[in-house]
Design a protein with these regions (language model features):
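N-terminal loops that bind phosphate or other acidic moieties
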Residues: 1-216
Length: 216
């Protein structure tokens, strides 16, 4: 069909126009911006004094949404934690527009991002923080457990609807109808004899009592 009322905005110009309209507030030099989904992750990151933007259910915020998070934030420069491989590209596009105001630690999930955020120091330089946070993130072995929404086959694994699925990079998918079994096998895929700490984060579908029971 025919397009009407087409409006094109230059995002860099828009960034500076909106900035001029803001009230003048004292911003600190350097901080962390994390993209998260869910109030639980939001609370954990905010406890570490990170600015947070919601990635929504799809974890797919636009470049403009990330830009607004920076524009309306508490810091002059940011280390951005995308926490999803699909968001890394959007963060990189924003970095091209805003230059050294944006620095990226390419976290692919909120567990990696949280570990990196714990290493942030407001007394350290951008370069020192980038190095320390990146090194910490590389030490993390993460996994996620979800439920299958349909019957499927992934690699050699047959998955049935409502099965628990354990997802670990470079490993076959764990699929079973028993949560404890899935948890045990999935943890086995990310741990070694040198593993010292295992942290389990759970969502609304699981109570604290059920979680504690399953990890015993």
């Amino acid at each position: 069909g025919t397009l009407h009322d087409i409006k094109c905005d230059n995002m860099i110009d828009q960034f500076h126009k909106n900035k001029d309209k803001q009230k003048v507030i004292a911003k600190k030099k350097l901080g962390v911006l994390a993209v998260v989904s869910g109030n639980g992750w939001k609370e954990l990151y905010e406890k570490l004094h990170c600015d947070v933007i919601s990635g929504g259910q799809s974890m797919n915020p636009s470049v403009q949404e990330i830009s607004l998070g920076i524009e309306n934030g508490h810091y002059e420069k940011y280390i951005v934690l995308p926490n999803n491989k699909n968001i890394i590209l959007a963060a990189q596009q924003l970095q091209k527009m805003l230059g050294d105001k944006v620095n990226i630690i390419p976290s692919t999930n909120p567990m990696e991002g949280l570990a990196a955020a714990m290493e942030f120091s407001e007394d350290a330089s951008v370069e020192e923080n980038m190095e320390n946070m990146s090194d910490r993130m590389k030490e993390i072995h993460s996994a996620s457990i979800t439920t299958a929404v349909r019957d499927s086959v992934v690699g050699k694994t047959v998955i049935h609807k409502d099965d628990y699925m354990g997802l670990v990079k470079d490993h076959e998918v764990v699929a079973t109808n028993d949560l404890h079994d899935c948890l045990e096998k999935t943890i086995g895929n990310i741990t070694t004899e040198n593993t010292e700490i295992i942290t389990v984060y759970y969502g609304d579908e699981l109570t604290e009592e059920r979680c504690n029971k399953e990890i015993e």
